């Protein structure tokens, strides 16, 4: 597929400029939002610190687990630091992440996390990932040893500054991606944002990539429960005439969430892009579903475009893509349209070379 090109001044701005080491998030649209102007398929480059933050149950661990699984699928090493101590191995397997004793740890303090990053031995030919989920759960020795604790959070903020300063220097020229998750807390200040991420300003300052994830709606499915599926229970119940003729009961269930990821800071590519992400319980990131919906919305179509066919029903389009193994072709289609949109925006904003005063 040909990637759009644009001219800037007297030089030629050619997309993309490929990174040496890059890992996918598992979401085509999120990959493109992160670095679509720098790499044809986008993705998260190694050698940086990234942070993803959001409310509880918004999908932070899902995104991090997917990143880890993508890295492992390409032969990369992963170390999952779990200060919260609640990562379930079966949950990790849903996303394809393989968690064993040697690549899982439960650090207590910020200093423990720094030591783990420095002792992590990154390979030469693959993209490796170090994950900490979440920073908010880390403590300091002052907090644990003192009766009063670290009330103002000053010691934790200081330790995080040291952690980030040393970490950024270590990984700057490596093939290691350091990814943190963080929570959103209510801000006690009467000014500015009503929410904040705990730990001070260290991570927002040093992180090259910050992602905010928000759930926009629950994915709800409805099922008609036919009396026939009651099996042997039905044989023990005496049904009246009206019961026999009554319609099947409809039961609804929340099966996932639709979220939007917003890039609030990026030194990788253009910031403030957004990407829709679908997360299905028991399945993981639904890239096919998100891509189909995005194409339909962006192109203003009345039907779902499934590579070479159109479908009225959403599930029929998904089934066709999976049966024909068209997942890659669908990703390429989405990438082509996305690059076309970016090309048009860049063409519109072209300016003559800047004059120095």
What are these regions (language model features)?
Residues 1-102, 118-122:
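The Walker A/P-loop phosphate-binding site
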Residues 75-77, 126-129, 173-180:
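Loop/turn-to-beta-strand initiation segments
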Residues 143, 186-190, 307:
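N-terminal cationic and glycine-rich segments that engage phosphates or anionic surfaces
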